[in-house]
From Swiss-Prot:
PANTHER family xrefs: G PATCH DOMAIN-CONTAINING PROTEIN 1
Family designation: Belongs to the GPATCH1 family.
Modification type Phosphoserine: residues: S6, S8, S358, S715
Gene Ontology MF term list: nucleic acid binding
Keywords: Acetylation, Isopeptide bond, Phosphoprotein, Ubl conjugation
Regions of compositional bias (Basic and acidic residues) in chain numbering: 582-593, 674-695, 719-737
Protein name: G patch domain-containing protein 1
Compositional bias segments (type: Basic residues): 851-886, 921-930
G-patch domain boundaries: 152-198
GO cellular component labels: catalytic step 2 spliceosome
N-acetylalanine sites (modified residues): A2
Signal peptide start-end: none
InterPro entries, per database record: DUF1604, G_patch_dom
């Protein structure tokens, strides 16, 4: 048993790497998931997938590039003594271990070579080697190499030899009879299909009789069949020129086109030197060639492709006149007269036909019958019911064709019970098939009454809608069901007159329309010969039948368009929850003004739309323009939501702003004018008069109605308006006041310049200061003259306004003047909304009487500035001290001016307004639309 165990152990072969045995009580480790596995080399280091030849940049010896060890070697070993041992390095010496591994660029793996080939070398290759040896400078030099090199046999060759196979024998089971050799007898000639005599075979058979029975022979060796596919268009066994040798060979090389293929094969098969008796030595021409003579071309034995055309060219004239390939136009020139008679152009390479073409036989068209209709009209399909049975009968009889029996039904209109009744079957007594069968008789009668009432209401509603929809003159064809219902209503509802009056399918032919209306009247009466009575007897039978069909189809299918549309539309199933709709913000209230301006033919700015449009950021980038709204997230027109169904959407009321020439109360006017003058608005600020003129809707309402402005009554000013007299204000005084306000508003006050440019004006050079002093001297005289004029105008203005009471008057300024004013105001862009600053209340309360005091204070401050500048010229060395003094004096002057203005307002100003009154006035101010 022990011996058997040892033998069995020796016979076992282990494959792969065995697992490490587990200790007792130790659990097997869990497999590591794929994402946690790492690739390591044989030394346990992380493998990096890059090397000198495997892609990526080498990071040095163990990735030490950039470190101290990577730049300087740790130990220096001289290689001077090992110079003799150096050998030629190959690519493998520069490769890493990864490159020589299984997945590298030069894996060291077992590769199949010639030793493991399935067959020996080809005989043709061996013969080629023999030829190379014969043509070598030293004949037979390659034979020595063949003697030295060992014979290489494949593994299959060795296996076959061990199995008893020998060269020249076939592979397979051995046979008993000997392979016979068939040698043809040269003296025997064979004629026809006769077989040769079998004398030689009989002699061989006699020889086979002497062989013992237990002798077997190897099978005959079979030559392998060449299964190379034919992938060209040449003939079988054709071998043309080698294009590589012919086109890319040396210019001195020639192709031997006349050397036979047998000679080439004989070279490959051997016996070259022996059969032809080739002598080795110098071969050349028989006669010598002089230095100045050229060698004759061997035109019979050599040929080059340079003598042939390699590019397709146009045929030279006259080349096609000769040879059997010439076209027929050169050969057949016997009938030139026929070609000359031909008018058209004969194409090159073609000639006129000698025989004419056979003409096609054309048959006449068939004759149409007299009652033929080129268009097929489909008859209206009317369901055969008890209600419209007489309609079907009238239609069938009037058209001259016998209609089908009303009682007969098609198979598609019958159910199982009706088919059973026709066949005479007894109905099956079983459970009730309908819920109505379980109801009592009273319930059934009540349901029937309700159904009749609903049917009656539906019929009345349809008749009413048909009568209402008779307003449209165009008729539309409907479905057969709709046509049937309208037909029934037209016959039974008494609406024939409305149909005849409104639906006129034959309006172009009044006589035909009249006959059609008569046909409808007779149809309503139920007369069977309605069509025959209406038709014209002078017409032919074909026309009468055609008109009969048209009348029947028109009476059936023509329904009013309103009833057709009402049957196609239903009420909405779901209502929208939102009661608001989005509209463009700038188009919300301008519709009525623009429409009225268009009616008055006042085109231009009144009908022009200005939208606030937010472009996309990409659009600004494409056109290289700055984004006008950089912080906006909107794209397009900003929209606001308003109520869908609101009464105010359809109202176009003018704004409650007063007219441009509307007067103000006597006490309110000086306060507002004084406040405007004291505030010194810039060119961007607009007065109330300009705001009133800017309202387009009010201007249009004035031009339309020529009425006064809406009166604004206030509780605080009502008593003062009643007490004031009513003389008409002088227009010349108002014009002077307007001119004065415009002149003063054109240039802002000096206080504004002081507040902005105070620090920068002190640091200017002395030369600029001298020029400013000269200019200020000239300005003083003009300002003093203007002050006197302004004081006088203000005094006259106050007296006139106090004595006068406002009276509504018509606008006197025409539209062109107003348009010019709007253009001047919008010269620097659109107007800005009015600014309400916290100090506006104090400025509004300053009366107009304090204006002269302010102008005097300004002159005083200017004189002080002038004196200080003169001091600066004298004391240029002490600039810092003078700057401090100037700042102190400026502060004192500004404080004095503010104190004086406050004291003036306290002394001469009216009582302060309450916050409620000020808020009410601010709400009454008209808003400007931009």
């Amino acid at each position: 048993m022990a011996a058997l165990d040892s033998d069995s152990d020796e016979d076992l072969i282990s494959y792969g790497t065995g697992l490490e045995p587990l200790d007792e009580g130790e659990r097997p480790k869990k497999p590591i998931p794929l994402q946690d596995q790492t690739v390591r080399d044989e030394k346990g280091r992380y493998k990096r997938f890059h090397g000198a030849f495997s892609g990526g940049f080498s990071a040095g010896y163990f990735n030490t590039v950039g470190s101290k060890e990577g730049w300087t070697p740790s130990t220096f070993v001289s290689s001077r003594q090992n110079r003799a041992d150096k050998s030629a390095l190959g690519p493998e010496d520069f490769m890493d271990e990864e490159d020589l591994s299984e997945f590298g660029i030069a894996p060291k793996a077992i590769v199949t070579t010639d030793d493991f080939a399935s067959k020996t070398k080809d005989r043709i290759r061996e013969k080629a080697r023999q030829l190379a040896a014969a043509a070598a400078p030293i004949p037979g030099a390659t034979l020595l190499d063949d003697l030295i090199t060992p014979a290489k046999l494949s593994v299959g060759f060795e296996l076959l030899r061990k199995m008893g196979w020998k060269e020249g024998q076939g592979v397979g089971p051995r046979v008993k009879r000997k392979a016979r050799r068939q040698k043809p007898d040269p003296g025997v000639k064979i004629y026809g299909c006769a077989l040769p005599p079998g004398g030689s075979e009989e002699s061989e058979d006699e020889d086979d009789d002497y062989l013992p029975d237990n002798v077997t022979f190897a099978p005959k060796d079979v030559m392998p069949v060449d299964f190379t596919p034919k992938d060209n268009v040449h003939g079988l066994a054709y071998k043309g020129l080698d294009p590589h040798q012919a086109l890319f060979g040396m210019p001195g090389e020639h192709l031997n086109l006349f050397g036979g293929a047998s000679e080439g094969t004989s070279h490959l098969l051997g016996d070259v030197g022996l059969s032809k008796g080739r002598k080795l030595g110098i071969s050349g021409q028989a006669f010598g060639v002089g230095a100045l003579e050229e060698e004759d071309d061997d035109i019979y034995a050599t040929e080059t492709l340079s003598k042939y055309d390699t590019v397709l060219k146009d045929e030279e004239p006259g080349d096609g006149l000769y040879g059997w390939t010439a076209p027929k136009q050169y050969k057949n020139q016997k009938e030139p007269e026929r070609d000359l008679r031909y008018v058209g152009k004969i194409l090159e390479g073609f000639s006129l036909a000698s025989k004419p073409l056979s003409s096609k036989k054309i048959y006449p068209p068939p004759q149409l019958p007299r009652d033929y209709r080129p268009v097929h009209y489909f008859r209206p399909v009317v369901a055969a019911t008890a209600e419209n049975a007489h309609v079907l009968q009238v239609l069938s009889e009037s058209s001259g064709k016998a209609g089908q029996d009303v009682g007969t039904h098609s198979r598609h209109q019958l159910n199982a019970s009706k088919r059973g009744e026709l066949l005479g079957e007894m109905p099956i007594q079983g459970s009730a098939t309908s819920v109505l069968e379980f109801l009592s008789q009273k319930d059934k009668e009540r349901i029937k009454e309700v159904k009749q009432a609903t049917d009656l209401k539906a019929a009345q509603a349809k008749a009413r809608s048909l009568a209402q929809s008779a307003s449209s003159s165009r008729a539309q064809a409907s479905t057969p069901d709709l046509g049937h219902s309208s037909w029934h209503l037209a016959l039974g509802g008494g609406t024939v007159t409305t149909r005849a009056n409104n639906f006129k399918p034959f309006a172009k032919d009044p006589e035909k329309q009249r006959r059609y209306e008569e046909f409808l009247v007779h149809m309503k009466k139920g007369q069977k010969d309605a069509l025959e009575r209406c038709l014209d007897p002078s017409m032919t039978e074909w026309e009468r039948s055609r008109e009969r069909e048209e009348f029947a189809r028109a009476a059936q299918l023509y329904v009013s368009s309103n009833s057709t549309l009402s049957s196609r539309f239903t009420h909405a199933k779901e209502e929208e929850d939102s009661d608001q709709v989005e509209v463009p913000r700038d188009q919300e209230n301008d519709v009525s003004d623009k429409q009225s301006a268009v009616k008055m033919k006042m085109f231009g700015k009144l009908t022009r739309d200005t939208f606030e449009w937010h472009p996309d950021k990409l659009l600004c980038k494409r056109f290289n323009v700055p984004d006008p709204y950089p912080g906006s997230t909107l794209v397009g027109l900003p929209r606001v939501k308003r109520d869908k169904y609101s009464v105010f959407n359809f109202l176009t009321l003018p704004e409650p702003a007063p007219l441009p020439t509307a007067p103000v109360p006597s006490e309110k006017a000086p306060q507002q004018r004084g406040s405007d003058k004291s505030r010194k608005p810039s060119r961007w600020d607009t007065s109330k008069q300009e705001k009133k003129e800017d309202s387009i809707s009010e201007f249009l309402s004035q031009a339309r109605s020529k009425v006064g402005p809406p009166k604004q009554e206030s509780s605080a000013l009502g008593s003062k308006e009643e007490q004031a007299p009513e003389p008409r204000p002088d227009t010349t005084v108002d014009k002077a006041v307007d001119a004065q306000t415009d002149g003063e508003g054109s240039r802002p006050s000096m206080d504004l310049f002081k507040a902005i440019f105070a620090s920068s004006s002190d640091e200017k050079s002395s030369s600029s200061e001298e020029e400013q002093d000269d200019s200020e001297d000239s300005q003083e005289h003009t300002e003093e003259a203007s002050l006197k004029g302004s004081q006088e105008a203000a005094a006259g203005e106050t007296s006139v306004v106090l004595a006068a009471e406002p009276e509504p008057c018509e606008p006197a300024t025409p539209f062109p003047i107003q348009k010019a004013q709007i253009d001047e105001r919008e010269e620097f862009g659109p107007r800005l909304p009015p600014v309400f600053c916290p100090n506006s209340r104090q400025k509004l309360e300053i009366p107009q009487k304090e204006k002269p005091k302010k102008s005097k204070e300004r002159h005083k401050s200017k004189k002080e500035h002038r004196r200080k500048r003169e001091k600066k010229k004298k004391h240029k060395k002490h600039k810092h001290k003078s700057k401090q003094k100037n700042k102190k004096s400026e502060k004192n002057s500004s404080s004095e001016s503010t104190d004086s203005s406050d004291s003036g307002s306290d002394d001469g100003g009216p009582a302060e307004l309450s916050p409620q009154e000020l808020l009410r006035r601010l709400k009454c101010l008209p808003l400007r639309r931009q």
